[in-house]
């Protein structure tokens, strides 16, 4: 079967840091540790496929 268009199977998330309440956009399949740009709190850690999110998800972006 040939795909006529490429489906986007990955998402970005808008998350809120639990410490400083900064909103930040991160990739769902992050391959490195994602820190908050304001306070340095860890927002996501890599887990093979999808990242383990340590922050509140506000919205899914495609």
UniProtKB/Swiss-Prot annotation:
Annotated GO biological process: translation
Binding positions (Zn(2+)): 17, 20, 36, 39
Keyword Ribosomal protein tagged: yes
SUPFAM superfamilies hit by this protein: Zn-binding ribosomal proteins
Keywords: Metal-binding, Ribonucleoprotein, Ribosomal protein, Zinc, Zinc-finger
Gene Ontology terms, MF aspect: structural constituent of ribosome; zinc ion binding
PANTHER family: 40S RIBOSOMAL PROTEIN S27 (PTHR11594)
Description of how the protein assembles with itself and partners: Part of the 30S ribosomal subunit.
Similarity comment: Belongs to the eukaryotic ribosomal protein eS27 family.
Matching NCBIfam families: PRK00415.1
Protein name: Small ribosomal subunit protein eS27
């Amino acid at each position: 079967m040939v795909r006529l268009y490429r489906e986007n199977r990955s998402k970005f998330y808008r998350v809120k840091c639990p410490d400083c309440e900064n909103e930040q956009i991160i990739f769902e399949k992050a391959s490195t540790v994602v820190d908050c740009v304001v306070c340095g709190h860890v927002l996501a850690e890599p887990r093979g496929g999808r990242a383990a999110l340590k922050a509140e998800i506000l919205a899914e972006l495609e």
